[in-house]
């Protein structure tokens, strides 16, 4: 199944460190009659222009995970798949992108509800920052099942303790989509047949809230 990406950078403003809950990104998924899948999103901020960059990463490119306080010894990974994306401030921090296998990944603002495991220097080689997670996903995986298996061996951490948490939307070439949230240090995968994701509260809350509108 073909996967196509649309990037919408609408009223963009400041980074996650200083954003407030009134700024809400929205992701949607459309399916065409021929079986194609289109994932799209807005990036809705409101204050000042963000330093966004378009990023193209080829197969074979090696990155090192950025750790808190510029600590050394971060996990290294070499791209199995080339990918393109919209970066925030630097090339490693991909907000939204897709790889050549047809898998797409995106992050969305998730303040007050998410909580990662604390950074442990002894586990630096297994740690990936929340803002670098999309890049790691796009570089390494073609399907959600592959990603889920690999998640058992990594720790998602907060690079900057001042920043709020994020959650992620992953869509693979089959059209399957999941939402990933880290709450109280635990990684949660939620199938997302609705194909819609916004910011906080948690995905289960949004799913339950739909019951209030089923009769409209």
Predicted regions and their residues:
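Extended amphipathic alpha-helical segments with heptad-repeat/coiled-coil character used for oligomerization
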Residues: 165-216
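Sec/Tat signal peptide C-region and signal peptidase I cleavage site
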Residues: 17-24
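Hydrophobic helical h-region of N-terminal Sec-dependent signal peptides
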Residues: 8-16
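Bacterial N-terminal signal peptides that target proteins for export
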Residues: 1-9
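A contiguous strand-loop segment
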Residues: 24-122, 162
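Active-site periphery "cap/insert" segments of enzyme catalytic domains
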Residues: 145-171, 176-179
């Amino acid at each position: 199944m073909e996967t196509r990406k649309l990037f919408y950078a609408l009223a963009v403003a400041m980074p996650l460190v200083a954003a407030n809950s009134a700024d809400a990104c929205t992701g949607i998924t459309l399916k065409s009659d021929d079986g194609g899948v289109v994932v799209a999103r807005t990036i809705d901020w409101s204050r000042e222009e963000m330093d966004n960059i378009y990023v193209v990463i080829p197969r074979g490119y090696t990155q090192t995970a950025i750790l808190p306080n510029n600590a050394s010894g971060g996990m290294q990974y070499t791209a199995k798949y080339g990918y393109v994306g919209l970066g925030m401030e630097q090339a490693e921090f991909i907000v939204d992108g897709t790889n050549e296998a047809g898998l797409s990944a995106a992050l969305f603002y998730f303040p007050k509800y998410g909580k990662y495991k604390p950074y442990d220097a002894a586990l630096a080689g297994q740690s990936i920052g929340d803002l670098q997670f999309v890049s790691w996903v796009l570089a390494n995986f073609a399907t959600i099942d592959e990603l889920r298996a690999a998640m058992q061996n990594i720790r998602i951490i907060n690079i900057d303790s001042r920043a709020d948490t994020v959650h992620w939307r992953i869509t693979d070439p089959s059209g399957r989509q999941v939402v990933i949230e880290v709450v109280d240090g635990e990684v949660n995968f939620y199938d997302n047949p609705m194909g819609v994701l916004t910011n906080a509260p948690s995905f289960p809350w949004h799913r339950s809230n739909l019951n209030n509108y089923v009769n409209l």
